Amino acid sequence: MFTSYQGRSTVLHAVAFVLVALSFIFPVVLGTSALLPTWLSGIVSILVALAILVDAGHKAFAPSERPARGLRGLSALAALTALIGWICWLFIFNNFDAAGTTMYKIGTFTLGTSAVLNIFCAAIAFMDWRAGRVTPVKH
């Protein structure tokens, strides 16, 4: 599964979505506290988003990667929104005065957007992987 971009993308986006869901979406929907510590899930999510960006950018314009360019672009967009959202939320988490400000609105919007984009990217990559439309790693 990790020998193709689609396989790696499926796993990375699924992990990114689960982290956002456990520490941001479920607490809002269920009205409870975060199921993971915010600082831990924020730092891990930032690292996963950076891994997604590096993976999406690596050999993105090679001729053999032409079928996956749309997925790579969407992956990069999902990673950028996750980075912006988590940086805003980590700032808000460490600064109580920032709650309710523009940064709160930006962080909430971008984390919600990244959750939707991550689940879409994971689904698209998984369907491409299952259909056999993969771009194998060439050394």
What are these regions (language model features)?
Residues 1, 64-74, 93-101, 127-133:
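Juxtamembrane/interfacial segments around transmembrane helices
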Residues 1-22, 26, 132, 136:
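Cytosolic juxtamembrane helix and N-cap/initiation of the first transmembrane helix
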Residues 8-12, 27-49, 71-74, 106-111:
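Transmembrane alpha-helix entry/boundary detector in multi-pass membrane proteins
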Residues 21-27, 81-92:
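Hydrophobic alpha-helical transmembrane segments and adjacent interfacial helices
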Residues 31-40, 66-67, 85-111:
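Interfacial non-cytosolic loop connecting adjacent transmembrane helices
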Residues 47-52, 113-124:
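Hydrophobic cores of alpha-helical transmembrane segments in multi-pass inner/ER membrane proteins
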Residues 52-84, 90:
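Loop-to-transmembrane helix junctions at the membrane interface
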Residues 57-66, 120-139:
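Cytosolic juxtamembrane helix at the C-terminal end of the final transmembrane segment
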